Each structure stands twice: as structure tokens, then as C-alpha cells.
Curated annotation (Swiss-Prot):
GO terms for biological process: one-carbon metabolic process; S-adenosylmethionine biosynthetic process. The gene is metK. Homotetramer; dimer of dimers. Catalyzes the formation of S-adenosylmethionine (AdoMet) from methionine and ATP. The overall synthetic reaction is composed of two sequential steps, AdoMet formation and the subsequent tripolyphosphate hydrolysis which occurs prior to release of AdoMet from the enzyme. Signal peptide: none annotated. Mg(2+) binds at D18. The keyword Magnesium applies. This is S-adenosylmethionine synthase. Its cofactor is Mg(2+); K(+).
Length: 402
């Protein structure tokens, strides 16, 4: 593994059109799981100028059964979508939460998919699809996330909080960030470049107002990155194309699942290709990605490695994973195959079956709306939210590998 290099990650804000789509899709997941913890949901969202479209497949007791919606269900779906967009802050001529056109094209789940996934008789619940899923952790930040992505997220979270509070009234919802760090000995030692492109109010692309916006962004960056990473050698690119008044879904169409690297590890780890948002936790694209992060984080938190990548693989309709792979990138204190064996010996994980994962992490709950902006990983485990960020396997792993 190289020890001296430059590495870059990007993030996008809650107002980015693809993230608007992700948040709507996950708000729908939460809505259905609040009605039926065993609901099946695959909800895709399209956002564009004054239009939101939902498409996908569902099954939910008391909401959609036998090919028909329960009374009031479609109205509740539309209300949920509009409230989600309102919370983000879109009240623009080209995209306004009160006035955009809305289309609901959700329909029933395929019976052929259901028969392969549902538990029946002596058959355990199978995986909702085939696929490979990866989890990762490293010791670059306190949350055991890649530093470049961690700081990219934090810049945008700070700006969004200031926009919502009124502290930065010139900001609009659509924003992107990018952080380049120099690493020495595998540790971040300097920020070489910071990129922030933010939608703004009228007039903030010239003169004193432009200077005010750029000074504000630099202040945010200084509050997020450690002081020893910043210097007069750090290059800033703030709205490098100039004006950015037209943004969000009015500037670019948004789709669910197009920010999978932002959602995960910022390019620092492999990705199996499956998006998370809009999917209930029987879909291993989501639940297995969460449990692999959980395992990787606990391995690093236990001091068993400085970096850890984990892969799981599944077949549709089959409950047991096809493979488990651990790679500590030469930083492990014990052999990788011994860590694999220790994981397989933890009974609480239920053999890493879809139901075992969901039961151990408590995933059959309406906890997904919060995941859909600023990353699914490196967040604080609070109450039912972000349970895959807990480090409650540390003692079990240490004991198994003593």
C-alpha cells in the first residue's frame, strides 16, 4: 500500500437533485415501514423542473394489497413527498414544494420475486437479489472514515445548517464539495485543494457579495478541517464557473441511486454497484452493505487493523451468503482468515443471513430518511438510527482472536 500520495473525495448536499431523489425515496421507505415492518419497497424517484415522479414496486399491509391502494394512501404518499422537499428548502420558481407536478407510479411487487425471497415452511427468507457488497473502515478520522470524504461531508453539513438557521441567507440548497489531501505514511498531512460550488441568491456572483460568499466558505472550511492541514498553499476553487443561481432539479434532473460513492467511502474502497435509497432492508444491496461497514468498523475499533475492507456475496432467494472476504491491507495484527473465522463464529449475526442482519441491527424500522444525505456511514449511532455505526462487537472480536 502506498504511503505518500494525494487523494480526493467529493460530497453533495441535501439539495443536489440526485440527493433530493434519494431523500424522497427513503421518505417513502420510512412511510411504508412505519405501517408494516415487513413491507417490501423498491422506490425510484425522478426530479426535474417542477416535476417529481415515483416508480417502483411495493407490498405493504393496510396500504397496498391485492393490487389496490387503501383509502387515503396515495394522498399520504404525495404529502410525504412534498414535506420532504419542503424540509430541504426548495421554494423556487423552477422547483417549489407546493406547486410541482407529482406522479405516483408505484405498483405491486412481482409474485415471482416474492416467492424466492419470502420465508415459507422450513425455508428461511432469501436475499432480495444477487450481488456483492463491501464495507470499509480506516483510522483516518474519529468516526473511522476516509478523511477526504469525512471533511467533504462536514463542509456541506455546516453550510446547510447555516442556510436553515438563517445565518447564511445567501445560500440556496444545491451545493457540492471536494477535498484533496496529501498523505504521508498513510496519514493526512495537508489539504492541497478545496472545491465548493454552491447555489446562491441573486448578485452573489460579482463584487462585494461574491467576496462575502467566498469568505464565508473559507471560514466554514477553516472550522471543519484541522488547522494543521490548512496553509497558504491550500488552493480554493469556490464557484469556479461563476454564477450558480439556477440549481437543484431545475438545473439538472435528479435520480435515485446516482451518488453511491458519496453515500459510501468516497472512492477509498470498492463498491458492489447497488444503491441504497428507496430499498427496504430485505434488499441486501442495503442491509449487507450496512453489516459489512459494521464489521469493518468494529475490526478497526478493536485495534485489529488500521484499514479493513469486507466483501459479502449473495444469490437471490438464498439465505446464506456465498462468500465472506476480509482484507486488512497489510495493517492487521492477526491474519485475515482468522478474522473471517471470528466473524463467522459470532452467533448474534445470525449467519449473516438477510433476516439475521435485519434482526441484529434492527433494520425493520423507519430509519432511512436521515441516511439519504451526507453519507450512510461515519454518522452517530443514536437511538434506532445508524445502528451499523455501533462498536459493540469489539469485545467479542478481541476475545475470539486472543
Amino acid at each position: 500500500m502506498r504511503s505518500n500520495y494525494l487523494f480526493t473525495s467529493e460530497s453533495v448536499s441535501e439539495g443536489h437533485p440526485d440527493k433530493v431523489a434519494d431523500q424522497i425515496s427513503d421518505a417513502i421507505v420510512d412511510l411504508f415501514l412505519s405501517k408494516d415492518p415487513e413491507a417490501r419497497i423498491a422506490c425510484e424517484t425522478l426530479t426535474t423542473t417542477q416535476l417529481v415522479v415515483l416508480a417502483g414496486e411495493i407490498r405493504c399491509k393496510g396500504v397496498y394489497e391485492d393490487g389496490a391502494w387503501a383509502p387515503g394512501a396515495e394522498e399520504e404518499i404525495e404529502r410525504t413527498v412534498r414535506e420532504t422537499v419542503k424540509a430541504i428548502g426548495y421554494e423556487q420558481d423552477g422547483f417549489h414544494w407546493q406547486t410541482f407536478r407529482f406522479e405516483n407510479n408505484l405498483h405491486g411487487q412481482s409474485a415471482h420475486i416474492a416467492q424466492g425471497v419470502d420465508a415459507s415452511g422450513n425455508k428461511d427468507e432469501g436475499a432480495g437479489d444477487q450481488g456483492i457488497m463491501f464495507g470499509f473502515a480506516c483510522d483516518e478520522t474519529p468516526d473511522l472514515m476516509p478523511a477526504t470524504l469525512y471533511y467533504s461531508h462536514k463542509i456541506l453539513e455546516t453550510m446547510a445548517a447555516d442556510r436553515h438557521s438563517g445565518a447564511a441567507p445567501f445560500l440556496e440548497p444545491d451545493t457540492k464539495s471536494q477535498v484533496t489531501l496529501r498523505f504521508d505514511g498513510g496519514k493526512p498531512v495537508a489539504a492541497t485543494a478545496i472545491v465548493v460550488s454552491t447555489q446562491h441568491g441573486k448578485g452573489y456572483d460579482e463584487g462585494a457579495k461574491e467576496a462575502e460568499l467566498k469568505a464565508y466558505v473559507k471560514k466554514v472550511v477553516a472550522g471543519v478541517l484541522p488547522a494543521d492541514l490548512l496553509s497558504d498553499q491550500t488552493v480554493y476553487h469556490i464557484n469556479p464557473t461563476g454564477s450558480f443561481e439556477i440549481g437543484g432539479p431545475d438545473g439538472d434532473a435528479g435520480l435515485t441511486g446516482r451518488k453511491i460513492i458519496v453515500d459510501t467511502y468516497g472512492g477509498a474502497a470498492p463498491h458492489g454497484g447497488g444503491a441504497f435509497s428507496g430499498k427496504d432492508p430485505t434488499k441486501v444491496d442495503r442491509s449487507a452493505a450496512y453489516v459489512t461497514r459494521y464489521l469493518a468498523k468494529n475490526i478497526v475499533a478493536a485495534g485489529l487493523a488500521r484499514r479493513c475492507t469486507i466483501q459479502l456475496a449473495y444469490a437471490i432467494g438464498v439465505s446464506e451468503p456465498l462468500s465472506l472476504y476480509v482484507d486488512t491491507h497489510g495493517t492487521g495484527t492477526v491474519a485475515d482468515d482468522k478474522i473471517e473465522a471470528a466473524i463467522q463464529g459470532i452467533k448474534e449475526l445470525g449467519g449473516l443471513t438477510p433476516r439475521g442482519i435485519r434482526t441484529h441491527l434492527g433494520l425493520n424500522k423507519p430509519i432511512y430518511r436521515k441516511t439519504a444525505a451526507y453519507g450512510h456511514f461515519g454518522r452517530k449511532a443514536e437511538g434506532d438510527h445508524f445502528p451499523w455505526e455501533r462498536t459493540d462487537l469489539v469485545d467479542k472480536l478481541k476475545a475470539a482472536l486472543a
